[in-house]
């Protein structure tokens, strides 16, 4: 079974119609139709430019623009008939335009190829997606700042190797994620700059013989600059790869954060409680409250990593210029953007609602000799070399393990077995508050520094 070749914009050179399966196999309209708004935006700018340089009359321009706006309305109303035999979003819209306004619709593609058209559409779409994602990052960061300020003095154990290390404040811990997200934001802003270059006017690969005004089209579409080489403009997708790389780093951060939330909500930790609206239950175990949102975000990170590898693999063997391989760029790019945006939205909604369990976190911080480093630092201030202090405290910890006592639970007499430099004032050092308050410098966990970091973060968000 074959399709009617007259449906194809390029059918003139062919002596038989395309096989029906091949038509379906090579079509992209089932997924690239989401570019319709940006495709129409680009076409309106292109028609405006063609009229300005005399390729179209003003009447033809107006007819094309009115027709395109009507088609956009049909698409958004759900009445547009997407046809697989017309291959893609571009030809579906152009065919419908010609149906509506007649032969003038066939003039729209003058001086343009689908190669530069789709490259323009994707860049316009990705530019908007990045803006939405940046907004979600900012919203999540705002929630983190609110939580950090609220919990500036709440003490929890800090971990290395998932073993108790030193006491930190819950607010300080939340600010670590704020910092990572700030870098994610910066990476996406940088990616947007390189995305915001206009391919339109490059035509198939060598440019066009028509007297086009690319600067005008660039201005109309809000691009920062036109692409400087037509071959490069139509063929490369490094901007999409860069986005997926930045998205992968952001999803890696969210995945790590998710892992902590999953641990902290478990019966073994019980550090926090998540509201019921962010959890689900079990079909068999009545007691279960599962942290599905962070678990899914952790799992979805793999989709974005896969999109990055897919695009790198897609591009690695292509000669210049455009190749049909590039049709495969959209689905991984779309999925990466959707996944990152939705994951950020879920976190931005969930994080401000976290309820730390202060007593449990504090009790956990009291276990595991979390103030051992503070005792070593105390001895350093008494004039001993740090390595000797490390050895002394190691012996004290060993004694504590054997007797079941934390350092703060030992008597002065017991502590002095390990160093006669230890005096009564050591017990102020060994408290959780003494430990966190002592780290009172930029980037430290002291409550005063947490509040200062929150203020800096609020100023950063206000400057965006």
UniProtKB/Swiss-Prot annotation:
GO terms for biological process: arginine biosynthetic process via ornithine; L-arginine biosynthetic process. It is found in: Cytoplasm. InterPro entries: Arg_succ_lyase_C, Argininosuccinate_lyase, Fumarase/histidase_N, Fumarate_lyase_CS, Fumarate_lyase_fam, Fumarate_lyase_N, L-Aspartase-like. The keyword Amino-acid biosynthesis applies. Pathway: Amino-acid biosynthesis; L-arginine biosynthesis; L-arginine from L-ornithine and carbamoyl phosphate: step 3/3. Its EC number is 4.3.2.1. It catalyses: 2-(N(omega)-L-arginino)succinate = fumarate + L-arginine. Keywords: Amino-acid biosynthesis, Arginine biosynthesis, Cytoplasm, Lyase. CDD domains: Argininosuccinate_lyase. Pfam families: ASL_C2, Lyase_1. GO terms for cellular component: cytosol. GO terms for molecular function: argininosuccinate lyase activity. Belongs to the lyase 1 family. Argininosuccinate lyase subfamily. This is Argininosuccinate lyase. It comes from Pseudomonas fluorescens (strain ATCC BAA-477 / NRRL B-23932 / Pf-5).
